[in-house]
């Protein structure tokens, strides 16, 4: 990774703020499980007390975005009504009840008598999180950071500025009632700060971008700090010859329409040729009723899909009520298409043939591979993680929805009684390498 000349040096003010967050994060990392649980409950209570102000602030952002012609997909993400806010608060309370991710002993090994090695989970340090039009992300990320013992520098899109400010004030007010320093989380407010954040190696340990393909790729190309995220969410649903048509339609509708602006919504529907006529006879009117615009290949157009899909469509993340449709000859045809166009986020198969389903689950190299269920389940909250900071499509861990376990690293601790390597090199001592109970 190289840093672009267009990325400014951090200002003295930003360096000072980042140093304050890092100092608070060091103390946070030493806090105990109970202190961090209480902090999250206090944050949830503060959000509830401030819910009226937060929703009102969001209305201001929505009105401004509407007058500026913000895209429908971004408008959907920007909206934070009372129901959505209450869900985020409930997620925060559930997060407080999850097991402590810190201090877990992953390895316990005797190297020799009185020479014992441990591997213990510890916080990463400070997270730098950049996101667009997702004010509920402030709640998710700040709460995950506190629960996992990490500080966080947050930069939301300008379109959500009023909402983000109202949320961060409530969260800090909640923390002020606890033993956790509110300075562990901070909100950046300008584009210059978000760009300069990319140069804070040494103060920030991980960058997490949540937003458009362009945003994620820009960040990946312009920082030396490790980046966790995905640049696209091109998800596929394959309907096998052995699919139950009613179930297939239900899953397809949910995977596309339940929240089309989500990165785990499907963008391409692949249909086995043997069921394509009967399935599309049911699906075309159902998708029309759901206001989904279908774009098809020549085979699906011959079966009633009205518009043509271009080569570009197969590689497009619509984030809208648009769905590409393709008829494939068999499972291998579906797998070939997925290999070529998938962003390795989430793919699903609908089939009552267990052997076919197992092959799909084994072969598809995506972060999530599902059988007979909606791709919309690819979510940290639905996985029981409490919340997520984002979804990683990289092969190295963490992968998929990243919750608490993805926000910790580990440290090796070795306790001895004066042992030196020379004694093992000359053969005076021998390693036992005996695993001990965790």
Swiss-Prot record:
InterPro entries found in the cross-reference section: Ald_DH/histidinol_DH, Ald_DH_C, Ald_DH_N, Aldehyde_DH_dom, G-glutamylP_reductase_CS, Glu-5-SA_DH, GPR_dom
One family name in Pfam for this protein: Aldedh
Biological process according to GO: L-proline biosynthetic process
Pathway linked to the protein: Amino-acid biosynthesis; L-proline biosynthesis; L-glutamate 5-semialdehyde from L-glutamate: step 2/2
Gene Ontology cellular-component terms listed: cytoplasm
Record keyword Cytoplasm present: yes
Catalysed reaction equations from the record: L-glutamate 5-semialdehyde + phosphate + NADP(+) = L-glutamyl 5-phosphate + NADPH + H(+)
Cited PROSITE patterns: PROA (PS01223)
Record-listed E.C. numbers: 1.2.1.41
Top enzyme category: oxidoreductase
Subcellular location: Cytoplasm
UniProt entry keywords in alphabetical sequence: Amino-acid biosynthesis, Cytoplasm, NADP, Oxidoreductase, Proline biosynthesis
Entry's Gene Ontology molecular function annotations: glutamate-5-semialdehyde dehydrogenase activity; NADP binding
The protein's role, per its UniProt record: Catalyzes the NADPH-dependent reduction of L-glutamate 5-phosphate into L-glutamate 5-semialdehyde and phosphate. The product spontaneously undergoes cyclization to form 1-pyrroline-5-carboxylate.
Family: Belongs to the gamma-glutamyl phosphate reductase family.
Protein name: Gamma-glutamyl phosphate reductase
Name of the encoding gene: proA
């Amino acid at each position: 990774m190289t840093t672009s000349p267009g990325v400014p040096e951090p200002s003295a003010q930003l360096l000072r703020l980042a140093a304050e967050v890092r100092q608070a994060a060091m103390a946070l990392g030493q806090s105990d499980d109970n202190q961090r649980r209480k902090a999250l409950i206090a944050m949830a209570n503060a959000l509830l007390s401030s819910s009226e102000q937060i929703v009102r602030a969001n209305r201001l952002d929505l009105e401004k975005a509407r007058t500026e012609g913000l895209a429908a997909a971004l408008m959907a993400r920007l909206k934070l009504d009372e129901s959505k806010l209450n869900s985020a608060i409930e997620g925060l309370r559930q997060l407080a009840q999850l097991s402590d991710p810190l201090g877990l002993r992953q390895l316990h090994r005797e190297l020799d008598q009185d020479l014992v090695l441990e591997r213990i989970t510890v916080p990463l340090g400070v997270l730098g999180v950049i996101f667009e039009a997702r004010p509920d992300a402030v709640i998710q990320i700040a709460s995950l950071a506190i629960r996992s013992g990490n500080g966080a520098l947050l930069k939301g899109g300008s379109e959500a500025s009023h909402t983000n400010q109202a949320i961060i004030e409530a969260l800090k007010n909640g923390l002020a009632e606890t033993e956790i320093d509110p300075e562990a989380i901070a909100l950046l407010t300008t584009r210059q700060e978000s760009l300069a954040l990319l140069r804070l190696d040494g103060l920030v340990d991980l960058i997490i971008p949540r937003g458009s393909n362009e945003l994620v790729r820009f960040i990946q190309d312009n920082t030396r700090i490790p980046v966790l995220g995905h640049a696209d969410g091109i998800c596929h649903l394959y309907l096998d010859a052995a699919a139950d048509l009613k179930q297939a339609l239900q899953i397809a509708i949910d995977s596309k329409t339940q929240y089309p602006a989500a990165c785990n919504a499907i963008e391409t529907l692949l249909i086995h040729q043997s069921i394509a006529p009967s399935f599309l006879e049911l699906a075309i009117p159902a998708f029309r009723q759901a206001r989904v615009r279908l774009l098809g290949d020549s085979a699906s157009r011959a079966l009633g899909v009205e518009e043509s899909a271009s080569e570009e469509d197969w590689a497009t993340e619509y984030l809208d009520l648009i769905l590409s449709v393709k008829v494939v000859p068999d499972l291998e045809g579906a797998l070939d298409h997925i290999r070529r166009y998938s962003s390795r986020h989430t793919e699903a198969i609908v089939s009552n043939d267990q052997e076919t389903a197992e092959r799909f689950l084994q072969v598809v190299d995506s972060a999530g591979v599902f059988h007979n269920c909606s791709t919309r389940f690819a979510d940290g909250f639905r996985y029981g993680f409490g919340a997520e900071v984002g979804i990683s499509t990289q092969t190295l861990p963490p992968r998929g929805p990243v919750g608490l376990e993805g926000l910790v690293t580990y440290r090796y601790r070795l306790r001895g009684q004066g042992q030196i390597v020379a004694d093992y090199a000359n053969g005076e001592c021998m390693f036992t390498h005996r695993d001990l109970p965790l």
